[in-house]
Amino acid sequence: MKLAILGAGAWGSALAIAFARHHQVTLWARDAEQIRQLGEERVNRRYLPDCPFPEQLKLSSDLAEAAHDAELVLIVTPMAGLRPTLKALTALDAPLPPILWACKGFEAGSSLLPHQVAEEELPADHLYGALSGPSFAREVAQGLPAAVTIASDHAEFAASVARELHSPLLRLYANDDLVGVEVGGAVKNVMAIATGVADGLDFGMNARAALITRGLAEITRLAMALGASPQTMMGLSGMGDLILTCTGALSRNRQVGLKLAEGKPLQQVLEELGHVAEGVATAREVLTMAERLQVDMPITAAVCGLLYQGHDPQQVVDGLLRRSPKSESGGLLD
């Protein structure tokens, strides 16, 4: 399969390395100097310094060249880059291939999910979907086993892409609940910040398990309010992604929580991180949406208080753990 991967950050580079083992891949970035450097060094030294590019991986800063004859375009930018990239693609004087995105989050200001942004920018009958699931870029680039989801409202399209790109080391599963997959992929980043704070304060593994489980309940309530299936939250893009992001040492959002627990201000944390942590921007959008839909999301509210209102990390987590008891008989809906 001929692929164009748009975005040469950590995840874009990792997917390009992984898919180039079995497919024709062109990795695109807007910055011509970045592409020149990547081409000369044949490695993304900033994000994946120990993961060299395969010889067959092509590089380009020309969007038309990268997308030419591609059978599939995969957009791997931060959420803020999705709409501009879609606009640039639709402006090309060429047929538009089917599109997947690996962006996770809600658009700042509009609170739109990725597929809602795509609906505004792509032709009504265009094939599109999301790639999401528990996957750290470094491990995928190193060829370690992983499993992710291809989600689309067009079930046959999702199944076809999953079959084409599936490999023993990167297993792909199709899902027709696009909303559920996107919500799971977005909100788990908020929960990872909370879990990172608890870990940083040495609250212990019991507290971590409680936050992850109740975080899953929050994600499920919001997803259902948006029309998703609760079953999706039990899959790779729900529980799977949540567990990895809340516990993995490579999780950027968990690192944000760990650093906040040290008493560092948010701006310093983000500067030290040097990477995009989508949960920071997503938290505010999620809370706004939850309030509009009247969905109870106490962990999200606590994270927003920590990020934007200067609340003390110790008091934030302690307050969550001291909330009034309630029945769990209704499962994830309570």
UniProtKB/Swiss-Prot annotation:
Q: Which residue positions are annotated as catalytic? A: 188 (proton acceptor)
The main location is cytoplasm
Is Lipid biosynthesis included in the keywords of this UniProt record?
Answer: yes
Q: Where in the cell is it found?
A: Cytoplasm
Question: What highest taxon heads this organism's lineage?
Answer: Bacteria
Q: What is its EC number?
A: 1.1.1.94
Q: Which reaction does it catalyse?
A: sn-glycerol 3-phosphate + NAD(+) = dihydroxyacetone phosphate + NADH + H(+); sn-glycerol 3-phosphate + NADP(+) = dihydroxyacetone phosphate + NADPH + H(+)
One of the entry's Gene Ontology molecular-function terms is: glycerol-3-phosphate dehydrogenase [NAD(P)+] activity
Alphabetical keyword list: Cytoplasm, Lipid biosynthesis, Lipid metabolism, NAD, NADP, Nucleotide-binding, Oxidoreductase, Phospholipid biosynthesis, Phospholipid metabolism
Question: Does the keyword section mention Cytoplasm?
Answer: yes
The entry marks the following residues as binding NADPH, namely: 11, 30, 104, 137, 252, 276, 278
Q: Where does sn-glycerol 3-phosphate bind?
A: 104, 133, 135, 188, 241, 251-253
- What is this enzyme's class at the first EC digit? oxidoreductase
Q: What pathway does this protein act in?
A: Membrane lipid metabolism; glycerophospholipid metabolism
How is this protein annotated for GO cellular component? cytosol
GO biological process terms, alphabetically, are: carbohydrate metabolic process; glycerol-3-phosphate biosynthetic process; glycerol-3-phosphate catabolic process; glycerophospholipid metabolic process; phospholipid biosynthetic process
Which family does the record claim for this protein?
A: Belongs to the NAD-dependent glycerol-3-phosphate dehydrogenase family.
Check the record and name the NCBIfam families matching this protein: PRK00094.1-2 (NF000940), PRK00094.1-4 (NF000942)
The UniProt function text for this chain reads: Catalyzes the reduction of the glycolytic intermediate dihydroxyacetone phosphate (DHAP) to sn-glycerol 3-phosphate (G3P), the key precursor for phospholipid synthesis.
Q: Which HAMAP family match?
A: NAD_Glyc3P_dehydrog (MF_00394)
PANTHER family named in the record: GLYCEROL-3-PHOSPHATE DEHYDROGENASE, GLYCEROL-3-PHOSPHATE DEHYDROGENASE [NAD(+)] 2, CHLOROPLASTIC
Name of the protein this chain belongs to? Glycerol-3-phosphate dehydrogenase [NAD(P)+]
Q: Give the lineage.
A: Bacteria, Pseudomonadati, Pseudomonadota, Betaproteobacteria, Neisseriales
| Gene name as annotated | gpsA
